[in-house]
Regions:
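Acidic, Ser/Thr-rich low-complexity segments on the non-lumenal side of membrane proteins
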Residues: 11-32, 70-74, 78-82, 89
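Cytosolic juxtamembrane regulatory segments of multi-pass membrane proteins
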Residues: 2-18, 56-69
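Hydrophobic alpha-helical transmembrane segments of multi-pass inner-membrane transport and secretion
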Residues: 16-38, 265-306
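Hydrophobic alpha-helical transmembrane segments in integral membrane proteins
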Residues: 30-52
């Protein structure tokens, strides 16, 4: 009974110290796990942002023009493409959602933050990326979505136009076409439609936009990587200047270049810095925990000496 009461007395007296030890230990674990998770997710993010060694993206330009830039780049560098992906798609932002009814931003709405982003591909592009056919009828679509509500729906309404969801898909553009909007919103969807031109014409007056992507993998991506990216940047910049109907300083149609080498450098800089800070903070928290335990034991020792000696 005496030993139990003594234990309770000590726990009450040292409650602050025990709580500090528990908090610091928890902070060590949280910081380590968080930093390790970010570092481990680096590869997946990189493959999502830059799935190919070199790529050219276009906004409101045709796929043929985008592909020509990549062909010019390969000729000038002497690189040979082991793998190539060339696609054209549409994208738009969602202003509001009520169950399976989506409202799209209008063409004149600027500086908005969408609730969700939708990328639209033709079934021909889907077959090109996956090797599978869908055979969609005129009012049918196939859907991949991160939206929990839409995953259970049988139909979808987009600005009052109704479509039947033929089937739910997996992430068919992963490691093939970049989705840069993942860093803006966590809620996004991919639609596959039977005819992308008909779908685009049905969305007149909305903020829907057209984009192209051409990506290639080469035999030795590290060979002259910086020099090659500078060349690809130059080719894309010169091609953008030659596009018709540009507003000076604010190009609506443009080309942009990217490389996995460049993206990897930026990601490594961010992730490496975060990982270092995580390790550094973990060491500080661990030292704090050790010091609290050490001085707590010393104080208890002096207290016992005064009581029993």
């Amino acid at each position: 009974m005496i030993s139990i009461s003594n234990l309770v007395f000590r726990m009450k007296k040292n409650a602050v110290g025990l709580a500090t030890i528990a908090i610091l230990s928890s902070m060590v674990l949280v910081t380590l796990v968080g930093a390790a998770s970010i570092y481990a997710g680096k590869k997946d993010y990189l493959m999502s942002a830059a799935p190919h060694d070199y790529s050219v993206s276009g906004n409101k330009v045709d796929l043929t023009s985008t592909k020509k830039l990549m062909d010019d780049f390969l000729i000038k560098t002497g690189e040979q493409a082991n793998e190539e992906v060339a696609v054209s798609y549409l994208f738009f932002g969602i202003k509001n959602q009520e169950t399976n009814k989506l409202t799209v931003f209008t063409k004149n709405e600027r500086k908005v933050v969408p609730k969700s982003i939708v990328l639209v591909f033709s079934q021909e592009t889907f077959k090109q990326l996956t090797g599978k056919e869908l055979n969609l009828s005129s009012n049918q679509i196939a859907l991949y979505t991160k939206n929990k509500t839409l995953k259970t729906q049988k139909s979808l309404s987009i600005d009052g136009k109704n479509y039947q969801i033929h089937r739910q898909l997996g992430d068919f553009i992963n490691k093939k076409v970049p989705n840069i909007y993942k860093i803006i919103v966590s809620d996004y969807s991919y639609l596959v439609v039977p005819d992308i031109k008909i779908f685009e014409s049905s969305m007149k007056g909305t903020s829907i936009a057209q984009a192209t992507y051409v990506g290639v993998n080469v035999k030795d991506p590290t060979h002259d990587a910086k020099k090659n990216l500078d060349l690809l940047d130059q080719i894309a910049g010169e091609a953008t200047k030659q596009l018709d109907g540009q507003t000076p300083g604010v190009p609506e149609s443009y080309f942009s270049a990217n490389s996995r080498y460049d993206a990897e450098g930026m990601v490594n800089g961010f992730v490496g810095g975060t990982f270092f800070i995580g390790i550094f903070l973990s060491i500080i928290f661990m030292l704090g925990t050790v010091l609290v335990i050490y001085y707590k034991q010393i104080s208890e020792g002096y207290e016992d000496r005064e009581r029993f000696v």
